[in-house]
Regions:
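Glycine-rich phosphate-binding loop used to anchor ATP phosphates in small-molecule kinases
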Residues: 60-110, 125
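The conserved Walker
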Residues: 18
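A glycine- and Lys/Arg-enriched "phosphate-lid" helix/loop adjacent to the NTP-binding pocket
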Residues: 98-165, 169-171, 178
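Phosphate-binding P-loop
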Residues: 2-9
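Hydrophobic anchor at the beta1->P-loop junction of P-loop NTPases
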Residues: 14
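Conserved lysine of the Walker
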Residues: 22
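Conserved substrate/cofactor phosphate-moiety recognition/catalytic segment
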Residues: 27-71
Length: 183
């Protein structure tokens, strides 16, 4: 944790289906709160290894790669760290792409203070790495994401609307989180 921090570093994870503005929102939030983002590792892994790299072992490597990037980002964060996805969403990807998940995912409990579940009310953009352009597949993935958060009993907030509405809702949620007494 950065020496400028006092108290516990809060973590907020952007969560949801592809092409819902998670990366853009994470970066905008980091600028607003003058902190950093732990980048999405799954995209990097897919760009290097291709879209066929989707076995349970690939998903485990992606999850652990994300944790490494998060640890590095934590050393530069101030008060709050924004994560562009995390191992929990990788578990959902593993279920869908690999037909199941490594048991490591079910033991994973290192949750952020808040998940921001981005709605699918934004247009899907094909970029060569994304999988689910079909509206029904996208909806199915979104519902699987929310079900995973509910199953784990974690704190989350659904955000939707245009990019400015999402940013305003996210800023309000993070402000409220930062105002809470630390545990």
């Amino acid at each position: 944790m950065n020496a400028a921090n006092t108290g516990k570093l809060r973590r907020v994870t952007l969560f949801g289906a592809e092409s819902t503005g998670k990366t853009t929102l994470a970066n905008r939030l980091a600028r607003h709160f003058v902190t950093v983002v732990a980048p999405e590792y799954g995209r990097t892994y897919t760009e290097i290894h291709g879209q066929d790299a989707c076995s349970k072992q690939d998903m485990l490597k992606i999850a652990k790669g994300h944790l490494k990037l998060r640890r590095e980002a934590e050393t530069h964060a101030h008060r709050v760290l924004f994560e562009d996805t995390d191992p929990v969403i990788t578990a959902v990807w593993s279920d869908i792409l690999a037909g199941g998940r490594d048991k490591w995912f079910d033991r994973f409990r290192d949750y952020p203070d808040l998940y921001l579940l981005c709605d699918i009310d934004m247009p899907w953009v094909k970029d060569g790495v994304r999988y689910f352009g079909d509206p029904e597949e996208r909806k199915k993935f979104h519902l699987a994401c929310e079900a995973e958060l509910k199953k784990r009993g974690v704190r989350y907030l659904k955000i939707g609307g245009d990019p400015e509405q999402r940013l305003a809702a996210a800023i309000a949620a993070v402000d409220a989180l930062l105002a809470e007494p630390q545990k």
